[in-house]
Amino acid sequence: MSEAERHRAKMEKRKAVQDAEVASKTIEKGLLIVHTGTGKGKSTAAFGLALRMIGRGHRVGVVQFIKGAWHSAERDALEKFGDQVVWHTMGEGFTWETQDRERDVAAASRAWAKAQEMMADPAFALIILDEMNIALRYDYLDLNAVVAAFSNRRDGLHVVVTGRNAKPELVAAADLVTDMTLVKHHLSLIHI
């Protein structure tokens, strides 16, 4: 048997296994996805999922818990899709900028109320809770109540939670967790 024939036979077997695996996955449910870790790209990865949902004709909701007036090109791009994307920036800035726990707790509570409202709205297929992990890390929200709300969310709703230091309870409840690891970042290469 030639190398090309061996390769073809190997790939035919692999295809049969893959096809069987895909065929066995018949349950459609919404996923709870967590993007965490010290690396960059957690929010950007979530916004990539938003593009996939928009491409399928679904509506996406975004609630930003921390970033405040932080401007992003991702927001500019997603807002070009009109009412397919509803964006709420609820935070008042990074916690080291506000330095006011009471204000941060109030902002996180407002953001969580908006998130719950959007999660209950069947018009949305995906809700992105950007930097919610930060609000949970500093106990601005009741972790048990948040996890319970995610566990009891309506069928078919996908929820993505981003931010560093995801709580173990949230990780345990999630269907998919990605830990972004910083290997190299261009900002560390700039010498001022």
Regions inferred by a protein language model and the residue ranges of each:
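Extreme N-terminal, non-catalytic leader segments
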Residues: 1-31
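Structural recognition of the conserved hydrophobic beta-strand(s) that form the central parallel beta-sheet
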Residues: 158-163
